[in-house]
A protein has these predicted regions:
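Serine-hydrolase catalytic core
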Residues: 115, 121-231, 237-238, 244-275
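Hydrolases whose catalytic domains are alpha/beta-hydrolase-1, hotdog thioesterase
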Residues: 70-77
């Protein structure tokens, strides 16, 4: 980088020149990016372990929430284990899987960038998924995509048949740079048509920026998780007041192409069975 700065000062490189690199984050402990499914299952199994240790927690409302990927996970949990969900509070969660986070290297599309005046670094996170060779066990099939998608009409119908007594609240910027607002609108319209208590706060323009809760129109709108829950959690708890929340084992199956993904309680764990 110092060499680039020197060449610019000597007039041998254009002042707007950036050296372009890519880099891969490798999580500790052998972890990797599976995108969605494993993390959602882990959340449910953490809930099960918590209730096992503190049985009185079993009757409390089960509310999941977060921003961006965390919001997507909260909505995905409502898909794979709706019987363990009373409410979801989401900020800017995607509706369809972001391929940059799954097969970004195959597509030459980094998940995010670091940059300054002299360099542009495209960042990936370690994953085994690929679309380059379908003989590989980590080939990302259409079925793998379908199960991670929240916007699938047949899956939504199955989800609602198991439990549509879920309150869903979401914030999303109409100008989200990931171009996900239209999909989020379609999803929440489907939720409502299926009988859910679903509210989407679509932030359309600068007039809705208050500088305290909503700070801009970019992805996430700089809404902190703390502010999100401070605003929405009391309202959701009020709606849930008097409702009984149980820990009842169940299962749900989603046909995806030539495969069926079944999420099932087995020996105090939620497990995924693929047939």
């Amino acid at each position: 980088i110092q060499h680039i700065i020197t060449l610019k000062s000597q007039g041998k490189l254009a002042q707007n020149y950036q050296a372009k690199f890519t880099s891969t984050f490798i999580p500790p402990n052998g972890d990797y990016q599976n995108y969605g499914i494993m993390a959602a299952i882990d959340h449910i199994n953490a809930l099960k372990d918590l209730v096992k240790r503190f049985p009185k927690f079993a009757d409390l409302p089960k509310i999941y929430g977060g921003g961006s990927y965390g919001g997507y996970l909260a909505l995905l949990i409502a898909k794979i284990a709706p019987w363990y969900v009373d409410g979801v509070i989401d900020n800017s969660g995607t509706v369809l899987p972001l391929l940059e986070c799954i097969i970004g290297k195959d597509l030459s599309r980094p998940e995010f960038f670091f940059s300054d005046l002299n360099k542009l670094v495209g960042m990936f996170i370690k994953t085994y998924w690929t679309r380059e060779d379908e003989r590989l066990s980590y080939f990302f099939t259409n079925e793998n995509y379908m199960i991670r998608s929240l916007l699938n009409s047949s899956h939504l119908t199955i989800q609602a048949s198991v439990n549509k007594n879920i309150i869903l609240v979401s914030y999303h910027s109409l100008k989200d740079p990931f171009n996900t607002a239209k999909d989020k609108q379609t999803l929440f319209l489907a939720y409502k048509e299926l009988g859910y208590d679903a509210t989407l706060h679509l932030i359309k323009d600068e007039s809705e920026i208050d500088g305290r809760f909503i700070k801009d129109l970019n992805h996430g709108m700089r809404i902190t998780d703390k502010a999100l829950f401070r605003k929405e959690l009391p309202l959701m708890l009020e709606k849930l007041q008097g409702r009984k929340s149980f820990m009842q084992e169940n299962s749900i199956s989603y046909p995806c192409g030539n495969k069926v993904f079944t999420f099932k309680d087995v020996e105090n764990q939620l497990k995924l069975i693929i047939n």
